Amino acid sequence: MRALLRDAQDQTRIALEVEEAVYDPKDNKLFLYTTSETCYAVSKVVRTNADSIIEELVMKGYSDLTQFESEQDE
């Protein structure tokens, strides 16, 4: 499973491949473990859609979608 996280302190985006996800109901946190045995504690899950993520990446200059040709179907 892949996850896109945002660092709580500096808002840096972190993309990672999750090896294991464990939910702790006592602390109300989700712990994501990677293949390099790094653990990320997730305290809030926000449901997003691909359009908003793509728009944000383009606006910040991380992605250039002008390289792809497109045409409208009739």
Predicted regions mapped to residue ranges:
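A short beta-strand micro-motif
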Residues: 2-8
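Short strand-coil-strand connectors
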Residues: 8-10, 35
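Acidic, low-complexity, intrinsically disordered interaction modules
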Residues: 15, 20-56, 60
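Short acidic DE-rich linear segments
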Residues: 69-74
